[in-house]
Amino acid sequence: HDGYVEVAALREQNIAQTYLSYMEKEGIFRKVAKGLYLKRDHHEDPYYVLHYRYKKLVFSLQTSAFLQGLLPEQKEISGYLPLNYLTQGISGVASRHVGQKEFTLGLSLAVTPRGNLVPCYDVERTLLDALRYPEKWEKEAIAALFKSAYPKADKALLQTYAKAFHCEGELALAVRLLG
């Protein structure tokens, strides 16, 4: 995990947490979240730390597009949470609570710039979310996303998602204008 050590992983290997506490005191590791430490000479991965702290967070919208390699990194991190989970949301994340169907459709994994695996939505779902929530995107970002992602998207899967989210018309219009 690129310099990360999880306390739970140490416990599984019957290694006492006191060793990690000692190494933290010596400056070898630093605590970045409850139960998660990072080696001194490694840079923090904000996506991995957020995923570690909030296991049910799924990166969405522009953050998903970035993690999928479709857009440059954005200042704001966005993610979806299931209903009734952390009802206050997450500090520093533009989070939105969604129902089970919306939460699970298009779930995928992506590798962060630091090499860690985190949950996000697949390319097809990210394209549809740009159409469903255009107010969350800059117009240029939607156009850039469609130009880079639509040619390689699975068109049948895109249609399946559009039908599930009742946005076939928006997709057809976007394909005519941007695709």
Predicted regions and their residues:
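Short amphipathic alpha-helical interaction segments
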Residues: 12-25
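Short, amphipathic alpha-helical "recognition" segments used to contact nucleic acids or chromatin
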Residues: 1
